[in-house]
Amino acid sequence: MKLNELYNNIGAKKNKKRIARGVGSGKGKTGGRGIKGQKSRSGVAIKGFEGGQTPMIKRLPKRGFNCISTKEYNIINIYNIEKALIDGRLSAADTITKEKLVEVGLINNKNNKNLVKLLSICSDDFSSPLSLKLDAYSSKAKDLIKKAGGKLL
């Protein structure tokens, strides 16, 4: 067998039907679109319209709601505060507040609207005695700060 002797099986490769190429082709004149009307024109597809039956979007029930009292937190890790202390961007003598964290660039708090929560992910040791005034703390973060001799205001 040679490469020039290879061929497709019979019926494996079929030419597609060319529509709207004369009445003798079997799909001529209107090209399978019917006569007149919106759907016979080019470029028309009515999104969500299912031919008069109730659309899927109306058949499915409404679900859930957006709670207006949900609190949105900016998350900060103890590791990031410790790194800022080492870099000299924060001072251990000062009380660390939301405004101070924004000023240093540890959090992005537009219009001072969001609350700040301190977490202790990947931090098992924390040695700096800090005084912090933030909105929320994880239980592990509280324990680490108190163990280091810090204060939560």
UniProtKB/Swiss-Prot annotation:
Q: Spans of biased composition, class Gly residues?
A: 23-35
Disordered: annotated span: 21-40
A Gene Ontology cellular component where this protein is annotated is: large ribosomal subunit
Coiled-coil regions listed in the entry: none
Entry function: Binds to the 23S rRNA.
Relate the assembly described in the record.
Part of the 50S ribosomal subunit.
Give the protein name, as stated in the record: Large ribosomal subunit protein uL15
Q: Which organism is the protein's source? A: Rickettsia akari (strain Hartford)
